[in-house]
Amino acid sequence: MGFREDFLWGGAVAAHQCEGAWQEGGKGISCSDVETAGDNVTGAPRRLTDGVIEGEDYPNHVGVDFYHHYKEDVALFAEMGFKAFRTSIAWTRIFPRGDEEKPNEDGLKFYDDLFDECHKYGIEPVITLSHFELPWALAKEYGGFRNRQAIDMFVKFAKVCFERYQHKVKYWMTFNEINNQADVTQHNLIQEGAVLLQEGDDAEYLMYLSAHHELVASALAVKAAHEINPDLQVGCMIGMNGVYPASPKPEDVMNALGAMHQKYWYVEVHARGHYPRHILKKFERKGYDFITEEDKKILAEGKVDYIGFSYYMSFATKYQGRNEKTFDYVPEDFVRNTYLKASDWGWQIDPLGLRWCLNWFNDRFELPMMIVENGFGAYDKKEADGTVDDQYRIDYLKEHIQAMKDAVEYDGVDLLGDTMWSPIDIVSASTGEYDKRYGFIYVNYNNNHEGDFSRSKKKSFDWYKHVIETNGEKL
């Protein structure tokens, strides 16, 4: 009973949130490099600037200096007993603009060195190819994934990575949280598909168009990986938040179903190799006609090997009188679930919802799964003696790991591993803050760019080490 013997315990980061060194080693400018810092206290959102502008605050330029500290950090991960470490390969370290003929050797070597360091300690790298780090030149000069040329650029990048690291990396994912763009905002469109909205653009159409191109690119990458090395396992990565009806009222139940349809059709394409009927009917109603016969063939031949997903919270939705036939949701339909507590950022804490999500995937696809992000962001306080008592993080993770364990023991879920977010404090992707901390490892740096990037252990460090030692039996 319990977790499999080879369960992949570990942690997850993204290159743009931790590496820094934004102009070192031949790296080009990514879309994340032109996103400013935000502020949870004032409510100021991140802004997208037209290139790098002097005087603006771009936290991703420095991250937590993982580029220079990775050996120290991997040693700390090993001390906790990590079996896996998930990160991404920054596309612009390999192809600085995205359209070069040959890859950048300095960038390739950095990841060679990082993966070698992981293997030195018996840590399995788990790699995302595109984690909000698309080339800025792809956005500015090609229109991002609204342009079919982006498919070829991504597949070329993926093939270079598969060929170079095929004997160092077994587990891969294509596009991180590809379904975030279901909420059609400029922030989500630039992070997912390097799409810059112009005056007169139909944003919803562009979301579906660029997502389709990403799904085709993903399927081609899956097929290429299997041709390069049949042992490679390529998954999708879905941002998963179960959606509950706010009440038993039938309209609320249908609205929750509509939200699940709208937010999670992407995984249907990844896992089944074709679009679900409800999305095809939507395209028919709206006159969207961009799926070619060749695309259908590619999608059918490029199904993923496993489902990777993030889980932080659940949502509740209430029918507001809109879309009485389609029950398409809008973000304003989401309401507070009064049965749940929330973090300082308003993220509702629902460990049982994680078990619900595992079952939702399992019932539909019967594929292996990997939870590649789950964690608790908080304002951590470092005491005068250097300690950080983050019992709240331990409590959050303990309840979520128990939910995973129950899904395995009672529901028959095939769970490969859990790489929690994130083992070390990093820049928040949503708000661009340092002070939203997730790690077992405290990084001495803050929103005001004060600190020396020194690392120290929080209370949760030793707790997680014990969890791994006992394969989740002792929480």
Language model regions located:
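Glycine-rich, proline-tolerant flexible connector loops at the mouths of alpha/beta enzymes
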Residues: 89-103
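Active-site mouth loops of central-metabolism enzymes
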Residues: 55-69, 146-149
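Catalytic domains of carbohydrate-active enzymes, especially glycoside hydrolases
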Residues: 69-90, 301-307
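Active-site region of glycoside hydrolase catalytic domains
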Residues: 1-54, 97-99, 108-475
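Short, flexible active-site loop motifs that bind/organize anionic cofactors or intermediates
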Residues: 60, 67, 98-101, 344
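Internal amphipathic alpha-helical repeat/solenoid segments
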Residues: 63-75, 96, 107
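A short acidic, glycine/proline-enriched capping/turn motif at secondary-structure boundaries
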Residues: 83, 92-94, 132-134
